Amino acid sequence: MRALLCLLSLVSLPALADLDYRLEPRQVAADTWVLEGRSENFSRDNGGNIVNTGFIVSEDGVVVIDSGPSLRYGQALRQAIAGVTDKPVVQVLITHHHPDHALGNQAFADVPIAALSGTKEQLAREGDALAENLYRMVGDWMRGTQVLIPAQTLQPGVRTFGSHPLRLLAFSGHSGADLAVLDEKTGVLFAGDLLFYQRALTTPHSPGLAQWVDDLQQLQAQPWTVLV
């Protein structure tokens, strides 16, 4: 029995060591980095990392756009940010309630986390079920992950961090409550999942394609230069 337990331990250690998201920030504009997820479905291979997250390094501190699919991802995101700047994270903005965008919130429990009111309501209503489903699909990557509802409620308008005025835009076409963030200094537009590239749309929470198309037309009209 002792030999069997030792063997199981040796088998499990490499498996745990492989649970590394290996996040690599890519600079897309001044003070702005993106961490690109895979163009895949959820799997035990990718750990749910099929999301594009990002962060802006302002004079006031770092603003994070989406926290990712798990506590482990959120922790890796904080480490990646620390590799770019020694400024603290001062704000997390969640674009919508889907699990790959909001289940990393625990890693930022010491930071103000904000979302649209509809996103907060959806996370409170559906978050546990979404997390449980992701646990089934990606396994141990999700260890310790629990739903953390954003404490702050966002309204459309402009919030400024240092020299970066961020225009907060509220839509609904993808999830029923979708935040897009336009940095008016750099022209970077974080569109969340309102935009898909070479992937089928995910529509279980969409109010309808007509609304989604209208949202896309409004996004297209924004003065963006880089689209995330």
Predicted features and spans:
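Solvent-exposed loop/turn segments at secondary-structure junctions
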Residues: 39-42, 62, 69-72, 97-101, ...
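Solvent-exposed, acidic/flexible segments
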Residues: 45-49, 67-74, 98-101, 116, ...
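N-terminal signal peptide c-region/cleavage motif recognized by signal peptidases
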Residues: 12-14
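Metallo-beta-lactamase
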Residues: 18-28, 61-63, 69-71, 121-170, 172-228, ...
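Conserved beta-strand hairpin/beta-sheet module of binuclear metal-dependent hydrolase folds
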Residues: 27-80, 180-192
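Active-site HxH/HxHxD metal-binding segment of metal-dependent hydrolases
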Residues: 72-75, 79-158
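Sec-dependent signal peptide recognition
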Residues: 1-7
